[in-house]
Amino acid sequence: MSIQDFKDVNIITAFITPFKEDGSINFAALPKLIEHLLAHHTQGLLLAGTTAESPTLTHDEELELFAAVQKIVNGRVPLIAGVGTNDTRDSVNFVKEVADFGGFSAGLAIVPYYNKPTQEGLYQHFMTLADASDLPIIIYNIPGRVVTTLETDTMLRLAQHPNIIGVKECTNLDNIAYLVDNKPDDFLIFTGEDGEAFHALSLGADGVISVASHTNGDELFAMVEAIEKSDIKKAAGIQRQFLPKVHALFSVASPAPVKAVLNHQGFDAGPLRLPLVACTDEEARRIIEIVEK
């Protein structure tokens, strides 16, 4: 488990959790979907994140999911486990559990939500997690869901810790540019916004933690490859075609749109767990038409 696991990793899929109609996890649906993703340029998988409907997963379900995916992937790409909560002690226990579990390259720890810590509180929270075990930590900064923002200067303080290896940044391009300019060389920056992948990578970010890679991985990879080859004209052309698909995938509360497309394509993504609900038939028809164009 180290930052080297992410060498040349640009596209990490924020993996959905497939459910059966009774609401239980559909473990039988995992192999087909995972093999599809790996065949279409997914270079890493994030489990039990936002797209996985993690607020509705029990702790035992998350561990079962980790074990099942780990067995299927069998070391072919790095795995990241969602380990963060708004309780530092609980998060520490989860980090230790995943570290002991083995086979995961990092844990994704969200900025604590609801209790609105100060910057110093956030700093101490993440330092405590990083000190708790040898599992590398990637910070998940998403104020749109959390309310609290981990400010860039606090992020850079945390980036000095050898066990805090990166960030999934869902703020803005100004922050990404500032982090790229000021971070340690071995600190990874992933945008968590599919629509900003073109700009973030052009600014020097390392990659994207993506929802759209479930359905449009080839396009995303082609864009990343063009940026790496400094063919900005080609990358921009792909981005112009890619953006409407991203907008469609987030036109209804995620992951309802991506599950609608995957179900249409025969991947048994299944329903969502309340309080999230599936797209209406009309919403699904419109989204599928755009995403598959």
Swiss-Prot record:
It catalyses: L-aspartate 4-semialdehyde + pyruvate = (2S,4S)-4-hydroxy-2,3,4,5-tetrahydrodipicolinate + H2O + H(+). PANTHER family: 4-HYDROXY-2-OXOGLUTARATE ALDOLASE, MITOCHONDRIAL, DIHYDRODIPICOLINATE SYNTHASE. It comes from Streptococcus mutans serotype c (strain ATCC 700610 / UA159). Its main location: cytoplasm. Pathway: Amino-acid biosynthesis; L-lysine biosynthesis via DAP pathway; (S)-tetrahydrodipicolinate from L-aspartate: step 3/4. GO terms for cellular component: cytosol. The active site is at residues 140, 168. GO terms for biological process: diaminopimelate biosynthetic process; lysine biosynthetic process via diaminopimelate. Keywords: Amino-acid biosynthesis, Cytoplasm, Diaminopimelate biosynthesis, Lyase, Lysine biosynthesis, Schiff base. Signal peptide: none annotated. The gene is dapA. GO terms for molecular function: 4-hydroxy-tetrahydrodipicolinate synthase activity. It holds the Pfam family DHDPS. Catalyzes the condensation of (S)-aspartate-beta-semialdehyde [(S)-ASA] and pyruvate to 4-hydroxy-tetrahydrodipicolinate (HTPA). CDD domains: DHDPS. The record marks 50, 114 as: Part of a proton relay during catalysis. Pyruvate binds at residues 51, 209. InterPro entries: Aldolase_TIM, DapA, DapA-like, Schiff_base-form_aldolases_AS. Homotetramer; dimer of dimers. It is found in: Cytoplasm. This is 4-hydroxy-tetrahydrodipicolinate synthase. Belongs to the DapA family. Its EC number is 4.3.3.7.
